[in-house]
Amino acid sequence: GEFKNIEEFKATTGGLMAYFYNEKSELREHIMDDLVSRAVGLMSWREVGEVLPYYCEGLIHLALLFEAGAITYDEQIEIDYSSYEALKGVYKRAYRDLAKHYISKADASLYLEDYAIKEAGVYLPKDEKVRAFVEHYYARYKAIGQQSVHIEDI
């Protein structure tokens, strides 16, 4: 089934839940930065089957980050640190829904379908704002993400 494709989200978000219930206000911006960085970085794994669960994790994170207003995208990602409380609420809801999903032993694809749909064999965000970002990021990654620079050329 699809459980492997929601497992990594469960693991990362479980850590976030532990933090939310024992948080330090001076770490809030760092937590948001790390979360955005992880979610964005995972988009590069889009076509690598062995790490599809990580890509799916990133799609869910991005959906939640956009939903909470924690990030916006207009040719570049902007992080709104004032949305921290909204972000926390969105993640608590998503994690509670995920726990209910596991308890009821429902098909994992039903949980994933809240955030992504499979088109031409690739999971893509359902939300248009998230999709616009993911498509732009992946096109840039394909164009320049695997280039290397020789030190002598600098």
Regions found by a protein language model. Give the residues of each.
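Extended, compositionally biased alpha-helical segments that mediate assembly or anchoring
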Residues: 103-154
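An active-site-proximal "capping" alpha-helix that borders the catalytic cofactor pocket
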Residues: 4-20
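Alpha-helix capping and helix-loop boundary segments enriched in small/acidic/polar residues
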Residues: 1-6, 27
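Long, well-structured alpha-helical subdomains associated
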Residues: 16, 20-125
